[in-house]
Amino acid sequence: DIGNFSSQGNIHYEVKEIDDDITEDIWWEAKFLDAIKNTEGTISKWGESPITIPAGDCTGEGNTPDESGSETPTDPVSYTYVFEDNFPLVGDYDFNDVVLDVETYYHREKKTNHIKRIQLDVTLAAAGASKPLGVGLRITGINKSDIREVKTGGDDSRFQESFNSSYNKFRYNNVTYMEDSDPSVVIPIAGEVHNVFGVEPGEMVNTGIGVTAKKYTYEVIIELADQTRTEPPFSKDNLDFFICYQYKSMEQRMEVHLYEFWGYGATAAGTIQQENLDLAGNNTWAICVPYGFRYPKETINVSRTDIPEASAYPEFIYWAQDRTQYTEWYEHPVEENVYR
């Protein structure tokens, strides 16, 4: 100990600043650090501790939990997903055929910090497609046995009614809220996106042309089979949102996935056609971007090299070709060419 201060146990310190009197005396600084450090803990710079306690009703900004057994949701992890339906062709490449705003909440038990359920709020923000499109979610890295139950909320009736559409390509189970006959976790989100908005397929919604409509949210609440986890069994990197549609007379639905998930192939009821991937190369027809992304207006190409100012995000094409370059392309729009 040093002076009247002593420390023992598994304690993690974050040091915001050290008084000048200490830093000017090497011997004193060493004694100070020895006094607060122990073999079970760590000393970190402010904000860099390896241990964090989520903020909540019982912890405030990180206090000792109380004895309550109730739950508190963490702040959401939020992203926007935008899709182009002309895969593997370029088309208008405006990335507004389907726009999803997604927020993920982890519901934790206050006392133990155990994750009880994970809630995905999937908001359908726009439908700029000229053909019927469905939306699904495959969660990679987990099994159906990892899920105790799936419940829904929000505007769920609008989304679920869309599975009655003649354009629906999902084998939707209205008890499990997952897709039948698929060993993977596949959760249908919308049988037909225009149907959710209450318009006919082909009607543009919230793209600057056509209809301006209210956005609707499908709450997907996944109760975990293992109720003792403190680390989530899946994260944004496992959320394989995709769009799908009927292609000619094919029995399987055509699916458009994020580039990051091409290696997983299609779901059991879908196809992506390997020749399409070969043709696509490094291009992409679905991207995950920061929440609230201002997507291109209808018919505005996301990126052009010939007339950059006529596109929505001139730097996008360079990022698509090499994802280590122009990684903040989405922060530099051509203002008059983006929506919201």
Each predicted region: which residue ranges?
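Extracellular distal adhesion/interaction modules in secreted or cell-surface proteins
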Residues: 1-340
